[in-house]
Each structure stands twice: as structure tokens, then as C-alpha cells.
Amino acid sequence: MRRVALPWLAALTLFLHAAAAPAPAADRASPPEAQRQASVSRPRLALVIDDLGQNLHRDLRVLQFPGPVALAILPDAPHARALAEKANSAGKTVMLHMPMAPAGGPYAWRPGLPHDALQHRLDEALRAVPHASGLNNHMGSEMTVRQLPMLALMTELQRRHLFFLDSRTNRGTVAAASAQQVGLASLSRDIFLDDDPSPAAVATQFREALALARKQGSVVIIGHPHRSTLALLERELPRLEEAGIDWVDMGQMIATRANRAMAAHGRDGVYR
């Protein structure tokens, strides 16, 4: 798993350095550069689908999405390994959807567990989801508010060259702030598509996500494999280009945000 993740982060580092370097004067006025600048100025969207690995037939619909969707796979799901292998072969981003309290199960991080036990559970979860280049929390409202375990997690992810996405299941989360503190490549979720999985509510959330992307320049969306969510995404994702939205992968979104908090999550780029 480390061998898979390391080239990804190395490429991201090169991307950040390249983006920071000034273009030669002769290139600044060239049509390709003008096109690149226009593309960079377009709003960007990153999409993660959580809770995968439980129903392979259903989850394969996510693999058919026409773009860089990230698949967040539960380590204790019966099809976790098979789906991770298929997603990696399809060129999609594989993520570990790491259970955290109040979630239960053999991999869950829970308050009161010693550091060695937390480390062991992370090791086993990553073995269950091969090719993971990052992780986000599954549930976790009881864990992501605890600074010491979150700092320990982010330090370990930094050592493994993995990124972190804070699902923000608790408004008091310190997970993203801990990632920022140790300099870990990380993001924070902006929109849950389907807290209410009714078709009308999912459609409303998707419109809100596009509006937020246009307002702040980027949006990170998390959805789940509900019928209503999959149906909406199958219909709407092919329309993003026409809508002026660039659908980007997690690495591009991390580079876009450069570990800075959005206004809803912090101040002057620093997480609250």
C-alpha cells in the first residue's frame, strides 16, 4: 500500500512546485497557457462515495461514473478487497473508510483504546483495503473531537504518505486541524449529498454543492450508494463540463486548496 501511495504524493508535490513557479515570459501569452489559466479559474468539484464494499453489484455502478470519483471502502465489508482491486484497475482513487466511534467492529477506533491497539486496527484496515491512497472517517463523532488520537493518526498517515479527508460528522472535529498542524495532505468535506436520501433532497444538495463551488472556487462532496444518489449522479455528472465545473481527483483538490480551510471551517485558511 505504501508503494502505491508514495508516487501519488510525490507527483502531487511536483504539481504544487510547478504551480508555484512563474511561467516564462514567452509562454504567458501563448494560447495553451491562456487555456490553462481559464481552466484553473473554473470551479472545481471532488466527489467521494462512502460506505462501499457491502454490495458489489451496486458499487460497480460507482466505477462506471465518467470521471475521477473516489471510492471510500469499509474494511469490514464483505467485498472490500475485490472492490478495491477493481477500482484501482479502473484508475479510480481508493480510500479507506475508517470506522471510528460510535461505529463498532474489529477495526473501529474507540476512546480508551491504547495507542498500540489503534495502530494495529489501522494496520489491519489498510490491509483489508489494498491500494488505499488516503482515508476518511466512517462516523467518528466520538473520536474526531479528541486531539491526541487525531494527532497520532495524522502523524502516522504522514509517515505512510497517505492523505486524510475529514468527513466532519461532528461540528467540533479537530481532525482537519490536526492534519494541518502536522502538514499532512488533507481536505474537509463541504457537502453531504444525502443525509436525507429522498430524490428531491439529494437534488437540492447537489445544486447547493455546485453553487458553493462557484462561490468559493471548489467543493468537496460526500455521497452514499443510495438509489437516489446514484441515479442523480449518473444523470448530472456528465453535465458538469457544460455547467462550467471541473471534476477533479483528490490529489488535484488537495493541490487546489493547499491544506487551507474554507471559510465555513476556519479563518484565514486555518481550521478552527
Regions from the PLM with identified roles:
Residues 2-4, 8, 12-15, 19-272:
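Catalytic-site microenvironment of enzymes
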